[in-house]
UniProtKB/Swiss-Prot annotation:
Gene Ontology terms: cellular component: cytosol; nucleus
Keyword flag Zinc: yes
Catalytic residue list: E178
Primary localisation category: cytoplasm
Gene: ASPA
UniProt-recorded name of the protein: Aspartoacylase
Protein keywords: Cytoplasm, Hydrolase, Metal-binding, Nucleus, Zinc
Alphabetized NCBIfam families for the sequence: PRK02259.1
Cofactor(s) for this UniProt protein: Zn(2+)
């Protein structure tokens, strides 16, 4: 009996981005290594290109020079007339777009893995932008299964107003890889090993797929963003409370109505309101202070993928 599956085109071109944020050093370190010796990321019949996305920020070990490269891959910025007056990252975004995009172009990259670190206690995290992408749900299922018993979480940023224009979004299949906790400007061996394994399993999945392996229907648990929460602020806009100790480092754990969220300097606890349990992520992320984000609320749900198989086999 012939199984019912979705026939997908073979994957031909993959890019691995490091240094989208220049002080998130695991991706920088790995990509620089793979540029020197890329044997471990090569797979038969697959073009895999490691790439430093924001070299100036990497050189200065800072998140960005003029603006956040991972927020400006929208039509407005990509369509601006190139000039020296443009912010460095906008010019760089246009260069990257022409090298790796456009999303549905004939020569565009099939998959871009964008490597990030977080100061939050998020462990191994895969970031998904489209809940209907059978191929990526299958890939994430494979990565999660391969990493077990090490947990690997899936963060779904599909949202009408909270989704942002990522560097990787120019690929047909964009994949964010976020591993922490790791301070900015620091390398940790355990975090590096985890990210390296995530890339290995992802490339193995692509190789098996291209070789004709059929992946049966699967389901994965994901955490979908529903709201970003700012710190409490005083009348001057200054932060008036910090993340409560009970919430610190509790990414992915349930936060119930009435549970402590923030703590003021005079000892007052500010609890979660409403009547819904949420799952916080990016708790107390250092890079998000400037974005006025103390953490993001997510809701937990299941995503299903149909069986897939490469169309050339």
């Amino acid at each position: 009996m012939t199984s019912c599956h979705i026939a997908e085109e073979p994957i031909k071109k993959v890019a691995i981005f490091g240094g989208t944020h220049g002080n998130e050093l695991t991706g920088v370190f790995l990509v620089k290594h793979w540029l020197e010796n890329g044997a471990e990321i090569q797979r038969t019949g697959l073009e895999v290109k490691p790439f430093i996305t924001n070299p100036r920020a990497v050189k200065k070990c800072t998140r960005y020079i003029d603006c956040d490269l991972n927020r400006i891959f929208d039509l407005e910025n990509l369509g601006k007339k190139m000039s020296e007056d443009l912010p460095y990252e906008v010019r760089r975004a246009q260069e990257i777009y022409h090298l790796f995009g456009p999303k549905d172009g004939e020569d565009s990259y099939d998959i871009i893995f964008d490597l990030h670190n977080t100061t939050s206690n998020m462990g191994c995290t895969l970031i998904l932008e489209d809940s209907r992408n059978n191929f990526l749900i299958q890939m994430f299922h494979y990565i999660k299964t391969s990493l077990a018993p090490l947990p690997c979480y899936v963060y779904l940023i599909e949202h009408p107003s909270l989704k942002y224009a990522t560097t990787r979004s120019i690929a047909k299949c964009p994949v964010g890889i976020e591993v922490g906790p790791q301070p900015q400007g620091v390398l940790r061996a355990d975090i590096l090993d985890q990210m390296r394994k995530m890339i290995k399993h992802a490339l193995d999945f692509i190789h098996h797929f291209n070789e004709g392996k059929e992946f049966p229907p699967c389901a994965i648990e994901v955490y979908k963003i529903i709201e970003k929460v700012d710190y409490p602020r005083d009348e001057n806009g200054e932060i008036a409370a910090v993340i409560h100790p009970n919430l610190q480092d509790q990414d992915w754990k349930p936060l119930h109505p009435g549970d402590p969220m923030f703590l003021t300097l005079d000892g007052k606890t500010m609890p979660l309101g409403g009547d819904c349990t949420v799952y916080p992520v990016f708790v107390n992320e250092a890079a998000y202070y400037e974005k006025k984000e103390a953490f993001a609320k997510t809701t937990k749900l299941m995503l299903n993928a149909k069986s897939i198989r490469c169309s050339v086999h």
